[in-house]
UniProtKB/Swiss-Prot annotation:
The UniProt record lists the keyword Oxidoreductase: no
InterPro entries: AceGlu_kinase-like_sf, Asp/Glu/Uridylate_kinase, G5K_ProB, Glu/AcGlu_kinase, Glu_5kinase, Glu_5kinase/COase_Synthase, Glutamate_5-kinase_CS, PUA
Amino acids binding substrate: 50, 137, 149
Domain PUA: 275-353
The protein's Enzyme Commission number: 2.7.2.11
Protein name as catalogued: Glutamate 5-kinase
Chief localisation class: cytoplasm
The reaction(s) this protein catalyses: L-glutamate + ATP = L-glutamyl 5-phosphate + ADP
PANTHER family for the chain: GLUTAMATE 5-KINASE, ISOPENTENYL PHOSPHATE KINASE
Gene Ontology CC terms: cytosol
Keywords: Amino-acid biosynthesis, ATP-binding, Cytoplasm, Kinase, Nucleotide-binding, Proline biosynthesis, Transferase
UniProt record, GO biological process: L-proline biosynthetic process
Organism: Sodalis glossinidius (strain morsitans)
Pathway(s) per entry: Amino-acid biosynthesis; L-proline biosynthesis; L-glutamate 5-semialdehyde from L-glutamate: step 1/2
Amino acid sequence: MNSSQTLVIKLGTSVLTGGSRRLNRAHIVELVRQCAPLHAAGHRIIIVTSGAIAAGREYLNYPELPATIASKQLLAAVGQSRLIQFWEQLFSLYNIHIGQMLLTRADMEDRERFLNARDTLRALLDNGIVPVINENDAVATAEIKVGDNDNLSALVAILADADKLLLLTDQPGLFSADPRTNPDAELIREVEGINDALRKMAGGSVSGLGTGGMETKLQAAEVANRAGIEVVIAAGGKPGVIGDMMAGASVGTRFHGQKMPLESRKRWLFGPPPAGDITVDDGALKAILQRGSSLLPKGILAVEGDFSRGIVVRIRSTDGRDIAHGVSRYNSDALRMIAGHHSQDISDILGYEYGPVVIHRDDMILC
């Protein structure tokens, strides 16, 4: 086994419930049992757990509730405390302390909050405490949700400068076709780079309790890989899966991280879900891609979404291709006013300015 490593383990609802309506306690105990010797050996373990809504529904004896966001948040509020209590009880069997962190998209979008979350996470790890992380579903609305714990786990892996991200699911890995409907589907063992062909292979989740299918796992793998983090998608029910993966055994589908990973700030730029889109003309597109230029207001054709200055947004071409992520120096309303204008006109149009560029090249990363 390698020297001390940082491992993020994401456990989906389908793994935690075994496909049923309640938490599969025996199976979760087994997963904790696999983590204990790794922790004792000096590895830094982080758990990203789903299951708050399922736990809340079980605790309230499966109430009949309207299918609304408020109902889900009610269940999450009740279930989150039950879920963290459960994790604490199990890890305490091995004299391991845990610390709870609840995150939202806003914690990832804002650079200062991102750094604060990173410092908290590292402090827990430095003191031998296992962080147990979930999205704060009790307060998060669509506008501030990461959206699924697959992508959340990739962002957590970036926060922690993790070596590996293990996505445990109800499937053995990524298949060439949907194994539930195609008996000829083959398990893909190694992936060097994610492309459109792989994305087409990704199927949806069959669990009504979860939010992430194989497509979101590919998105998470792509984000983590760009940061140099190795990702494995594997079956959570496979005996010894965590230890086998750490020992380098062939488990599930392994996505290799970039050999030249992004620097720390660039990782952050690619991590948060973009708060909005900026469509640019062909001239701006060429300047960004071929000359590494900053984005000027003159090259902006359209702005979508509502966002503040200092937030990560996405730059897109006129044919809808994702070109880059970057930090906008102007909010969305201001951008709509200065779009298509020269930089020297910004002050006259807005009555103020934060400089001649909308997104500086140092605050930008190509997709």
